[in-house]
Amino acid sequence: MYNPYQQQQAGFAPQQTGFAYANQPSQQPQQSQSQLANQATGFYQPQLQQQTLFASSQFQPQTSFGTVASIQPQQTGYIQTQPTGFASQGIAAPTVVENSSLKIPSIRLSFITAEDQKKFEHLFRTAVPKGEQAINGDSASTILLRSGLTPVTLAEIWSLSDTNKSGSLLFPEFALSLHLCSMAKRGEPLPGYLPEKWANEVKSFVDAISFSVPEDPDKILANTPFASFSGTNTQDDWLSNLNNQTNSAAATSNFGAPGFTSFQPQATGYGGGLPLASQRTGPGLASIGTTSFSAPTAPTAPTAAPLASQRTGGGTLIPLQPQQTAGLIPAQKTGPLNGFPQQLQQQSTGYQPQLQQLQQQSTGYQPQLQQLQQQSTGYQSQLLAQRTGPLQSQSTGFQPAPLQSQPTGRPGEWGFVHTPTGGIPGLNAMQQHFLPNADLPTNNLQNQMGGDLKSNVTWAITKQEKSIYDGIFQAWDTTRRGYIDGDVALNVFSKSGLSRPDLESIWTLADTSDRGKLNKDEFSVAMHLVYRRLNGLDIPLRLPPELIPPSNKYLQDSMDTMKNSLRGGVNNKSYSGGKQTKSDGTRFKNDDDDFGYVSNARHRRRSTATDNGPKSIKSSSDSDLSVEDLKKLIREKRILIDALDAEDQDAVLNKKKESQHNIDIIEKLKSQIKDVQASLNSKGLDAPIEEKKQLLGVLNSLTRDKVPNLISNIYKVHNDIAKAKVELLKAKLLKQNPSWNPDSNESEIQGTGPNGEVTELDRRKFQSKQLLKQRMAALTGRTSNSGSNADLDLQLKQESEKAKSESINQSNIVKDIESSIKELEDGCATHLQTSATEESGSEKWERGQGISAEVAAFVRELNSFAESQRRNIAAQNSSSLESSTVSSTAEVSQPASSVSSQPVSASSSYRTPEERAAYIKAQAEKKMNERLAKLGISRSRNATIAEPNPPTKVDAQPATPPVAPAVVESAAVSPPVKKQPPPVSPRSVRVEQQKPAPPVDSSSDDDDEEYAAILKQKQQLEAKEKERKLAKQKQKQARLDKIKKEMEEIKRRQAEAEAEEDSDEEPSSVPTYTVSNSAPKAVAKTAEDPVVEPVIAKSVEQEAVPDQVAAPKAHESNPFSKVQATPTGNSTNPFFKPTTKESTIDPKKAAAQRASQRGLSKNDGWSDSDDNESEDDQPNRAGAAQLASLLFGGMAPKSKESTPQQTPQQEKTESEALSKSVSTLKDPSGSDDEFSTPPPDAPSQQTVAPPIPTEVPPIPTGAPPIPTGAPPIPTEAPPIPVGGPSSFAPPPPPPPPPPPGPPPIPNAPFGAPPPPPPPPGPPPPVSNGVTAPPVTADIGALLGQIQGGKSLKKVDASQQKISSNDLAGTVLS
């Protein structure tokens, strides 16, 4: 029979329920010892009758507990955990008391194993006192400190576990803390915060505990016939006496041990009123009377302290395994009884008032309690233990029918029944067969199915079956989603070997929601149907109620309730006839027993109480109405009708007022919208989205297509320029030194390795020597060049590094410009970008799409209003727009600061899209001009208008000529005519150059062209600037090196000359001192008359003007013209004069003179085809006369007469001026540079050409070694070197590839005044300045006389440049 107290018990193996001895009195017939061994206890099928404690009146149990041979009392009901076993006599074993009143829901924590959770629960129950639900901090700290962890670690564990921050731990929090302790003990790191899964499980567990309300005994006893007995506990209470009898019977058992047990008192049965929900069933002892109940006897007091543990049984027999029975339930009928079987089967549960004392019967503790959950009942050893929850309260009283079995299990499970006594077939084989890795034949599974036990397979799913089905589900649900897809389920069910129609029917029944996948409950239903089919049972057409999952049932009930409420309403529900469904513990309600009766009277009308009285109000439906009553009713109806009419009129008036009010509000809103539109039109903010998109597309095409390409091209040009510079220098060096191999740096290294190979040590030594030479040269002021190729390699290396650095600098400038363009792009894009919301709003509110007809009509009206107002504003502002355009054009032509300020002032007043476009362009132009201004760049149109300085320089030019010949003073009538063309022609050229540049306007095409022109201008500027700097560096370095070499050579030659020359040299320079003394006077006199111009130079001026007009074309827009004028134009340099006067000197003869003097050739070096000595390769050398004068001056003895004291000073002055003139001519490619400084006009430079003969005397002072015929020659030779300080310029270097004209001559003479002249002297004769052509003949005579000199030595190429010895050790900048 099914016992409601046994539904929490797991099945056990057949156990003996007691021991029968020979001397046991025979009351009711009882089964023998051997028969007892075969008893199977546990859950029975419903057809078995339940033996109950309460027997009928015709059957009175008569069991005597006074004799020794009485059956041992068995534990019934939920027991406390007590140690069992044999205890020594007289000594009580220590006990651990659990708090059985603690309510802990049966919830499984996934991160803790089931075994650990049981241990933690046991520890928690022993640590929590009664009446509490949580363990306090002190008790928890005592337990946690036993782990041996540090306090810091325990503090972290506590902070993680105490989720509610209450200072105490509920069971899930306590279990979490112990789990974290075990993790820390294993060496695993503690998490910084709880994983989300853990936290959710713990919080759900805590909520379940918090929501659970302890059951109140008064509520349980309410509305039951036992409520009146809740407070009675008299001496004649048979349950109390029975408890004492039980203890005495245990004490006087045949074991002779003292008291039977010290069990904690447990409430068993229904009499005591205490709930059985939280009790836990355990191994039970046999009931007091197995086959009969005896009358209560006098209790026997125990003679000694109760034993803490005791095993059932006695003597030398094998002790029984602990058997678990229900509370206060007699032994189950497990076989035929030799007594009154029919009477026992017909026993009904009743109430015996004398059995109340059984309420206090103590139960024992078995140490195998935890293992009991693993024991199986009957023949099934594979059943898993099911966690049990609180028992449902049963109605008590005299019940003629036996109690029905109640479902138990974890929350979310349904209708589980216990495994039948005989077991069910093939369940174990099914578990092994359906696992994923199992590959067993189907015949093995089908052979174990069926048989005699197939009748035990019920519709309901047993606990064991459910556990097996869940295990199979978890094995196949690898993704842990809680679902199994159709294809996976097909693989699982196909293992059964069933036919396809059967599997389709099973799937249809299981997949109730038709989702194509099964959850855990639906999978269990499908597996149970498969199991039934394998046992030969038919598949039902509809799912039976026992197999409907609780989740589906609850959902369906809720849906039915909702449908009923929606269909009939809540008020139409009959509460009196409604069925109150009994809710079980699986729903975890706070108090499931408190349903609270609600009377249906609350839905009745309050006036129903007076309905039965006499009616005082007449109605038209009454049959006994008089005439007066009818008249009265008519008046009342008229009054009601009038009231209704008045209400209707008021409603109509109110509606009209409200409608008019709404119309007024709408008109007001329309006027406000029009005002806003007018404001937008006046400010130019009403541009449509299409225009913004168009402008944004143009911006993207410029910034994402054109600008990146231009920048990449600029970078490429920079790299090409750097490489070209290096290659150009390499070509020049190779031209000067044909034997130099730039690819081989080891030509000068002497190898010490095998076969003369150069080793790494040799290279390091060579580098160290070269470095030492360079340092010594830097300290002593001497050159480190020893005639080897190392200097050439070093120069090439330095030039390569300079080219790279310049390329990097230019790239940085380009990057700055790129960043400024990016800023402009971002600023414009923020104003032009539109969002999806704006686009959708534009479709709706600008085109009237997707809105009501009235609103669409207003939108169209607003568009027409905006268009008309836009035209009016455009007409009104047309003149102002033109004026603003003109003003903006004028302001753009101003410097960058004024240009940048103009768009800001105009940006606040643009009103039309055209004005806005002009504003955006002005903003971009402003930012670009600011960036260019920071870089020192100004636009071409700005430079054209804002550059009025060159004409003033040309006008001021006649005031600064350093010298003028006295002979040409009479021919000075034409200077005003000659001065006027130079300022006019450059200006006209500039105007012509500006014509291709477009004027400033508001069109986007012009903006694009302007932007492209700016970028082109910037690129040209960078390229020319790089070339200029590179040429300057190269020339400066070459000049320094060669000057140092010349100083060394001069010193060496002076030493040799002093040792070799005779002391009888003739002082042929005596007459020249008078000439040199007279030169300053001529200079001073010429300075006083600046307007004088030579007549001879007139034709030369007219030929030079076109060249100089063509030259500035490439650099009219150069913003650096003013800046370059200062560094490049050394106004104090008297040497920069036009080179056209060099035509009076034969360069071939001068070259032959130098070669003969230095002994470069065996045929005396007078060849006309010496390419290595061309003047183009020596840009820093002066003319032939200058070289001869320097040579003669350097060979003169240091201290022979007093005159050489003036010669070094003059030579120093000349060399300084020469260095300055060379520095001004450092950029030969400036003629085609857009941004180079425009050259001055030719006439201003030609005017200073005549003073060539004025400084004839000072140069030939150093010519004593010349033979006797030499003295007249120096008087004629100096015209050329004299022009050096005032008008001579070095020969121009090779022009760049696209030379538009001759190299520009810096405007140095227009700067500071020339240096102060020496003391004045008598003016030279006129013939000295006019007879320039005879100079070549005199030089030829001089060269013919020099041919006889054999003392001159032939030098190498590195020593071919000489200079004054006064410049030794000085650094020229």
UniProtKB/Swiss-Prot annotation:
Residue ranges of domain EH in the record: 116-205, 465-554
Coiled-coil intervals: 1007-1066
Gene3D superfamilies: EF-hand
Location of the protein in the cell: Cell membrane; Endosome membrane; Cytoplasm, Cytoskeleton, Actin patch
Annotated Basic and acidic residues bias: 581-590, 1019-1030, 1038-1056, 1139-1149
Sequence ranges of Low complexity compositional bias: 290-309, 341-362, 878-909, 965-977
Annotated Gene Ontology cellular component terms: actin cortical patch; endosome membrane; plasma membrane
Main location: membrane
Pfam families assigned: DUF1720 (PF08226), EH (PF12763)
Listed Pro residues bias regions: 1250-1326
Sequence segments annotated as region (Disordered): 271-362, 385-409, 562-622, 739-758, 876-914, 931-1089, 1103-1335, 1349-1373
Membrane topology (UniProt): Peripheral membrane protein
Positions with biased composition (Acidic residues): 1057-1067, 1167-1177
Annotated GO MF terms: actin binding; calcium ion binding
SUPFAM superfamilies assigned to the protein according to its UniProt record, in alphabetical order: EF-hand
Domain EF-hand: 149-184, 498-533
Keywords: Actin-binding, Cell membrane, Coiled coil, Cytoplasm, Cytoskeleton, Endocytosis, Endosome, Membrane, Repeat
Polar residues: compositionally biased ranges: 389-408, 571-580, 739-752, 1070-1079, 1118-1134, 1154-1166, 1357-1373
UniProt-listed SMART domains: EH (SM00027)
Annotated GO biological process: endocytosis; endosomal transport
Residues annotated as domain WH2: 1338-1355
Function of the molecule: Component of the PAN1 actin cytoskeleton-regulatory complex required for the internalization of endosomes during actin-coupled endocytosis. The complex links the site of endocytosis to the cell membrane-associated actin cytoskeleton. Mediates uptake of external molecules and vacuolar degradation of plasma membrane proteins. Plays a role in the proper organization of the cell membrane-associated actin cytoskeleton and promotes its destabilization.
Family recorded in the similarity comment: Belongs to the PAN1 family.
Subunit-level organization: Component of the PAN1 actin cytoskeleton-regulatory complex.
This protein's name: Actin cytoskeleton-regulatory complex protein PAN1
Species this chain originates from: Scheffersomyces stipitis (strain ATCC 58785 / CBS 6054 / NBRC 10063 / NRRL Y-11545) (Yeast)
